[in-house]
Amino acid sequence: MIKIKNLFGCAVVGLSLLLGGCSDDEKGTGIGNMTLDAPKVSDVTYKSATVSATINEPSATVIKRGVCYSTEAEPTVENSIAEKQGAASTISETLTGLAENTTYYVRAFVVAYENEPIYSEETSFVTPAATLDEQLADYVAPAYEDDYTAFAGWEQRDRWNLANVHDPSVVKAEDGYYYMYQTDASYGNAHEAGGHFHCRRSLDLVNWVYLGGTMQEIPAWVKEKLNEYRAEMGLEPIESPVYGCWAPVVRKVRDGLYRMYYSIVVDNYIKTGAPNNEENFDNSWTERAFIGLMETSDPASNVWEDKGMVICSSSDKAMDGWTRPSLGNWDAYFYFNAIDPTYIIDGGRHWLVYGSWHSGIAEIEIDPETGLPKNKLGNPWGISNWTTGTYGQLVARRGTSRWQGSEGPEVVYNPETGYYYMFLAYGSLAVEYNTRVLRSQSVNGPWVDINGADAANGIEAQPVVTHPYKFDNSNGWVGISHCAVFDDGDGNWFYSSQARFPEDVPGVNASNAVMMGHVRSIRWTEDGWPVVMPERYGAVPQVPIKEGELVGDWEMIQMDGNHVGQQFGSAIMTLSADHKITQGTWKGGTWSYDATNQVLTANGVKLYLQREVDWEAFPRSTTIVFAGYHNSNGTWRTDWGKKVE
C-alpha cells in the first residue's frame, strides 16, 4: 500500500510538471481569489517603520501573514520578516532594528495551509539619518567586563575584546578597520599559545575581534646576528637565547603597504650567555635588543613578511665595556636600547624614533623604499658621534644618567596645530607608568615641553597626560602609558594604551597583572596641547552640551608628576546655576561656558568637555567629562573630571 501511494504521488508530481510549475505568486488549493494590495509605509524613523497592506478576499486557510523586507530588491520570507499567525483582512507590522539612511524593499505576504507564500507588489522606503539627540537617547554603553580573569585563557580569546592588551599600536587601514598590534604580555601568559605581536581589529574602536599572532616563530636572523656580534666581541655563542617580544609600531606607508617595526629583547647575560636571573648574575649587563621589520599589503590577512634587522642596541663604550660591578649599578653598557620604535613620514622622508630607559630616545632616518636605515650601520660599540646617519641622534631624555625612566615614544603630526608631538612613558610599567608630551615644529626637534624646555638636555617633561587614577565606586587604574596616538581621518584624535588593575584588588588573583586596552578621546587646547579624556571612549553620540547640563556635582581629579606611583583620587566640585563654585578645591571661584567650543572655564582654568561613558556607574551610562591643564605656583596640574549629578 505504501508503495502504491508513493507511485501515485510521483504520477501527480509528473502531471503537474507537464502542466507547468507554479510561481510563488500563483494561488494554490483552497486559496480562492485572495490577493494582496501593495503595502503602504508610514511612521518611518531612522530605526523603524510601520508597513500595512490589505488582504482581498482572505481565505480561512491562511496560517500566517506578514511583511518581508531586505536591502535587496524582491525580498522573500527567506529574508527578514515580521509576521502574525492566523487569518485576517489586514496586515500591519512595525519593522525595528533598521539601519539609518538605508533603502529597504518590502512586500506583504500570506501563507495558506499547504501552500507557497503569496506576495504583494514591492514597495521601497528610505530611513533617514538619525539625529544626534535620537542616537544619544538610544545609546547603550559597552557591556564587556574589565575583570576578565575568568576568561583570560587562550581558549576564551573570542571573548577578550580589549583584554590582554599591552603597548598597543593602532592603524586605520584601507578597509575601514582599525588594527591594533601589541607586546606579547598577557595575563597568565595566554599569548604564548599563539605566536607573537598579536592583532585585533575594530570598526568602531569599542568592539574588537582578536585575529591572532602576526609572527609564529622568532626569525632566524635574530640569533644569527646576535652570535655574529658575540663572535666579534670574543664571546661564545648563545645556543638557546631567551627572547622577549615587545612594543611593535604599525604604520600605513601607502595604499597596499603597511610596515611593522617590532622589538625583540635577548634576556641573557653578555659574559656567559646565561639567562637573566639573580642566581646567574655574572657581573655583566644583559644582551642587546633588536628592532626588526615586517610588511604586509593586507592587514586583514594577518600575514606579514619579515624583512630582517633594522637596528640593534648600541654603545659608546668599547666592545668589552660590558662589565657591571653589581645589580645595583646603573651605568648601563648600551647607550641606546633598541626597543619601542615609532615611525613617522614627513614630506617624503621617513624617520624611526626608538628607545627605552638607558640614555634616552634616538631618531634615525629610514630609506622609504626598503624601510631599513638610510645609511649603513657600523659596529654597535665604540660610537662617539651620534647622528641620524648612525644608530641615531639623541632627541629626548629624562635626565643625564644612563638609566632613566622614560620609554615608549610615539610621534605624530597634527596638521591643525602645525606641530609634531612626542608622547613618552615615564616610570616603571606596573604601577607608576604615566604619560608626558613634547612638541616640535620639526620632526628633528628641538622637542620642548609646555615650559619650553628642550628635552634633549634632560628634563622632567610637563605636562602629565595620563596617570594612575581612581574615581569613586571603582578600583581605578594604574600603569596607564606606552600609548598609540592616531586620528580617524575626520579630525577626531584618540589615545590608546594599556591600563592595569592596582595591586591587591580583593577577589582578583594577581590583580596588577590584569591589563586592559584603553581607548580615549583627545581634544586639543587653544594653545595646541593634547588633553586626554578621563573616561574611556565608548562611541557616545556627541550631542552639543548645553550650559544647564553643567550645573551640579562633578568628581574631579587633580594630578601632577611629583607623586611617583600614587593613584590620584577624586573630590566633589559643585557648580551652581548662578555660575559659582560652591564645593571643592576651587570653592569660591566662578565658572563660565563657551558652548561653541565646549570649553568650561572654572576658577580661570579652561576645561575641555566631551560626552563619554561613565564606566564606574552601574549600569554604565553616559556622562560629561573634562580634561585640562593649569600651572599652580610653578607646578603643572592635570585636571580630570566627570559629571555625577
Regions found by a protein language model. Name each.
Residues 26-27, 129-645:
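Carbohydrate-active catalytic/glycan-binding domains of CAZyme proteins
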Residues 13-15, 104, 112, 174, ...:
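N-terminal processing/targeting junctions
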